[in-house]
């Protein structure tokens, strides 16, 4: 077997080759929702924006499923290849693909069956509900395709082809972007047009991803590779649980935030719908930055996983620290944009009255104040997943959302009203950053002693 370049190539080159396509692919998940929101905001108004925000948890749950199986199987593949166990790698990949399909179909059926109940739980108000139901009932059709595409993109990167992974995701986004204005404005389908454009783009990406099954180079499939094995499935899910649990926590905090904003917003001059619409815009804007961080972390995973499996700990340390530097550059640019140009960013998502822009600007500046450090927690969680310490990775992934943000979102508004919801973000970001630095520092010191 040819020696894998992950074990000897310069780390900076590997990170560039793997992370940049991963960033592009990761951005697509955010772009699907943001492009819809921009066109829907222009065509339908802020109630349309609020509707896509209420439906957004469906996308984050979908991504959580894709990460559970995709990251889990890809991490297993990288570790097995690093240990020179090609048959085990093929089994991990094959079982991962089967799980993606099964989970995708189950998710579609559950979502469509309980749609009205779920939308109300997500915070849909009386005025927003009809738009949200129309949008979500259509976009749920594309969720199984999105799960397989996102999951497969991780396996394709583990196979050493990050550029093809990027192409799969980007082409779907291009189709979506082209169809959005046609369906919304030319065909006059409104919010349904944005939903159908999203689904068609997702199906296109799915077809491209599925074609790669016959192109794997480091993985050689046999029929047995696709026979579902319970033990292997458990290993896959255990390795993907940290990334997935973070997304689940994102979904939970979205639901809590939406309900808190409508409750406390009703007690202010902003009302219920303005905070709901503004929150979604701020979150989806921040999702672009988080997608870049996720892309960097996904790009480092094969590098860290392979070299940890090969016991080349100095390369593990180098890859992690370089990824942190990349993250700080991105976060600095984001901080400047969010603090100095918030109204320009918010205006992209459609018009609104003076109160709408007043609250949206306040939300962006306050909630995203600690964007400089909030990516370190994601990188650190991914780091532990890549080296096979999935429990520690899962716990770290949950720190910001579950241990800090959810309690703060529930408690701070009791003292500060609607401002408490906004202040919860930066406090949680800083707390998670400190914990991440401590845990990774201990692990890197341990690896250094084992060299």
Map each language-model feature to its residues.
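Short alpha-helical transmembrane segments in multi-pass integral membrane proteins
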Residues: 1-22, 77-142, 186-241, 304-370, ...
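Residue-level signal for short hydrophobic patches within transmembrane helices
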Residues: 12-31, 35, 58-65, 141, ...
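Transmembrane helical elements of multi-pass membrane transporters/channels
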Residues: 17-36, 138, 172, 201-205, ...
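Transmembrane alpha-helix boundary and packing residues in multipass membrane permease domains
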Residues: 22, 26, 38, 42, ...
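Helix-terminus/linker motif at the lipid-water interface of multi-pass membrane proteins
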Residues: 31-50, 119-126, 182-189, 251-282, ...
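Small-residue-rich hydrophobic transmembrane alpha-helices
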Residues: 49-109, 146-165, 258, 278-342, ...
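Hydrophobic transmembrane alpha-helices of multi-pass small-molecule transporters
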Residues: 61-64, 176-180, 206-210, 288, ...
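Short runs within selected transmembrane alpha-helices of multi-pass transporters and secretion channels
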Residues: 70, 139-157, 165-173, 194-207, ...
């Amino acid at each position: 077997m040819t020696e894998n370049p992950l074990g000897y190539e310069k780390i900076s080159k590997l990170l560039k080759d793997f992370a940049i396509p991963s960033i592009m692919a990761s951005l697509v998940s955010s772009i699907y929702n943001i492009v819809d929101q921009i066109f829907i905001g222009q065509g339908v108004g802020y109630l349309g924006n609020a509707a896509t925000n209420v439906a957004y948890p469906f996308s984050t749950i979908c991504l959580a499923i894709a990460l559970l199986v995709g990251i889990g199987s890809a991490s297993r593949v990288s570790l097995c290849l690093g240990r020179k166990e090609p048959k085990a790698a093929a089994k991990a990949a094959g079982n991962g693909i089967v799980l993606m399909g099964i989970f995708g179909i189950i998710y579609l059926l559950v979502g469509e069956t309980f749609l009205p109940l779920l939308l109300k739980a997500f915070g849909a108000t009386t005025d927003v509900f009809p738009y949200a139901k129309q949008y979500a009932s259509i976009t749920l059709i594309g969720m199984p395709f999105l799960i397989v595409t996102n999951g497969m993109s991780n396996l394709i990167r583990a196979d050493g082809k990050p550029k093809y992974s990027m192409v799969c995701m980007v082409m779907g986004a291009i189709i979506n972007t082209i169809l959005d204005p046609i369906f919304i404005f030319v065909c006059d389908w409104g919010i349904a047009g944005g939903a159908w454009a999203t689904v068609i783009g997702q199906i296109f990406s799915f077809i491209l991803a599925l074609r790669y099954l016959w192109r794997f180079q480091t993985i050689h499939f046999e029929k047995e590779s696709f026979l579902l094995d319970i033990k292997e499935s458990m290993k896959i899910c255990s390795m993907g649980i940290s990334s997935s649990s973070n997304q689940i926590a994102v979904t939970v905090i979205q639901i809590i935030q939406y309900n808190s904003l409508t409750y406390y917003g009703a007690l202010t001059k902003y009302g219920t719908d303005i905070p709901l619409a503004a929150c979604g815009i701020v979150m989806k804007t921040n999702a672009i930055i988080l997608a870049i961080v996720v892309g960097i972390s996904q790009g480092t995973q094969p590098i860290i996983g392979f070299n940890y499996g090969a016991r080349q700990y100095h390369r593990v340390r180098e890859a992690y620290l370089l990824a942190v530097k990349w993250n700080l550059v991105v976060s600095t640019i984001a901080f400047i944009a969010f603090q100095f140009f918030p109204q320009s960013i918010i205006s992209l998502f459609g018009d609104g009255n003076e109160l709408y822009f007043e609250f949206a600007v306040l939300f962006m500046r306050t909630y995203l104040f600690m964007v400089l450090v909030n990516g370190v927690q994601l990188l650190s969680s991914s780091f532990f997943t890549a080296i096979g310490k999935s429990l520690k990775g899962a716990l770290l992934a949950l720190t910001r959302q579950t241990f800090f943000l959810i309690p703060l979102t529930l408690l701070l508004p009791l003292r500060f009203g609607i401002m408490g919801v906004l202040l919860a973000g930066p406090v949680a970001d800083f707390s998670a950053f400190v914990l991440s630095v401590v845990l990774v520092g201990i692990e890197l010191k341990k690896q250094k002693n084992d060299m």
